[in-house]
Amino acid sequence: MDNIKIIVASDSIGETAELVARAGVSQFNPKQCKHEFLRYPYIESFENVDEVIQVAKDTNAIIVYTLIKPEIKKYMISKVNEHALKSVDIMGPLMELLSNSIEETPYYEPGMVHRLDDAYFKKIDAIEFAVKYDDGKDPKGLPKADIVLLGISRTSKTPLSQYLAHKSYKVMNIPIVPEVTPPDGLFNVDPSKCIALKISEEKLNRIRKERLKQLGLGDKARYATEARIQEELDYFEKLVDKIGCPVIDVSDKAIEETANDIIHFIEQNKSK
């Protein structure tokens, strides 16, 4: 028995149509259903359709297609009917059923599945990046980061990094401590990618005292004293002035509000 020719035609890469076709073929004895796939991706014109139709006529092939753009799909159907060819519309019936059920018009944009997949994997990469480079663990992350957060302890660097990662930004955060020299690479990073997180002395004092209580320690530890906090804030301001990056006051802001401010800064600089 001759091989059955199956033409996979799509206005995207054709992966969906081929997967469905292969699933169908797998239900038959391979000895009785010898087959060959011919993929025609990115069908964007009537001429592309004509090419598929000609090959189908010459080889007596079955056309399996996912064509989203209405004018291209309509032309394919007319040509298939004109030449009495065998064909299967993979997406059309489902899209029509969904459209009627929810009373909404489809986007009619090819490749949406892959765009969604790309967005998902980009977000996962960003989340993994935020974990790997949290708290300045590895300075090698600096040139790879979309955003570098700077701040002294208890300025919400880690939760902000995670929140922004879920927005698909690769974020590294670096703790600013007077006794610890910042990584050399920090001064080579574009200042427009750096965001310094500022907090008032009073607010930080309250947060740190509460943190010490949670740890079962007295609130008189140096970590929460006004002198220590002022020392850290002074060092922070000198470092930020040297870098020349934007500063956001997080004293009375929710994580979401601060994150939106950061995104605004970053996107504004991208458009310059």
Swiss-Prot record:
HAMAP family the UniProt entry points to: PDRP (MF_00921)
Catalytic activity: N(tele)-phospho-L-histidyl/L-threonyl-[pyruvate, phosphate dikinase] + ADP = N(tele)-phospho-L-histidyl/O-phospho-L-threonyl-[pyruvate, phosphate dikinase] + AMP + H(+); N(tele)-phospho-L-histidyl/O-phospho-L-threonyl-[pyruvate, phosphate dikinase] + phosphate + H(+) = N(tele)-phospho-L-histidyl/L-threonyl-[pyruvate, phosphate dikinase] + diphosphate
Organism lineage: Bacteria, Bacillati, Bacillota, Bacilli, Bacillales
EC number, as in UniProt: 2.7.11.32, 2.7.4.27
The protein's name in its UniProt record: Putative pyruvate, phosphate dikinase regulatory protein 1
NCBIfam families: PRK05339.1
Enzyme class: transferase
Record: residues binding ADP: G151, I152, S153, R154, T155, S156, K157, T158
General function of this protein: Bifunctional serine/threonine kinase and phosphorylase involved in the regulation of the pyruvate, phosphate dikinase (PPDK) by catalyzing its phosphorylation/dephosphorylation.
Alphabetized UniProt keyword annotations: Kinase, Nucleotide-binding, Serine/threonine-protein kinase, Transferase
InterPro entries referenced in this protein's UniProt entry, alphabetically: Kinase-pyrophosphorylase, PPDK_reg
